[in-house]
Amino acid sequence: MIETPAHKWIAKFSSSSDTFNVVKSEFVAMRLAALAGLDVAVVQLTAAAGRDVLLIQRFDRQHTADGYQRRAMVSALTILELDELMARYASYETLAEIVRHRFDAPVPTLHELFGRLVFNVLCGNTDDHARNHAAFWNGSSLALTPAYDICPQARAGNEASQAMLIVGQQRSSRLATCLQAAPHFVLDDAAATALIARQITSIQQHFDAVCQEANLAEVDRNLLRVRNILNPAIFEGAPDALQRLVAGFR
């Protein structure tokens, strides 16, 4: 934990066992998510004792004249009334239904949640389990917290699955699955496709600059580009218009 005059920060350190630069890859994904218009935690990169360090600004602490005050939070696992043994049953579809009834500003919240689902698929973050989603609780209603822990995951092949079910029993990391779920987020097919297209365009526009900002090594940059970010497998079954958007990314 690191404290500055106005903020508290959580520090994540690189590990000697990492097979790629996890810390910088998470920074890249979080910055790309913010540039794509999502509400995400503020992140910074630094180094300590020769190791890369990712700093994540705590959004559950508010600085006041009397010091820091805690903001009550609950994880999506708790909201879904599941425990760790039942976490595999956590579902974006079910979470969307709860948002409709228990969250402030449900429609924009649903659109934000759908955007986060899509971005997780686009950037290869398959570790989107229910503890990696949360909401503020004010005693009467819920409000989505900024997104956090968005990190591309190592994958052995092209096919991948999200940690949370997306719609029905489907969790495949494909844009077609996201589009199938879109009505649960109050989005018709055209609106959902347009949202996905905006994110794809934003990622391509900002990828190189954000990697440069992170001073990400060329080998790790190429790994993200080839294996994680906009992986060809996620476009299986997606509209041709979306597939054409990434023709020049690699």
Give, region by region, the residue ranges found by the protein language model.
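Long, amphipathic alpha-helical stalk/connector segments used for oligomerization, subunit docking
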Residues: 195-200, 218
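Regulatory N- and C-terminal appendages and interdomain linkers associated
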Residues: 141-142, 205-250
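Conserved kinase catalytic-core segment
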Residues: 17-36, 91-155
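Conserved ATP-binding subdomain of kinase catalytic cores across diverse folds
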Residues: 1-89
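A glycine-rich phosphate-binding loop feature that marks nucleotide/adenosyl-phosphate handling sites
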Residues: 48-53, 117, 132-139, 198-200, ...
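Catalytic-core segments of enzymes that bind and process phosphorylated/nucleotide-bearing substrates
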Residues: 75, 79, 83-92, 137-192
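A short beta-strand motif that forms the metal-chelation/ATP-contact edge
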Residues: 53-59, 146, 204-211
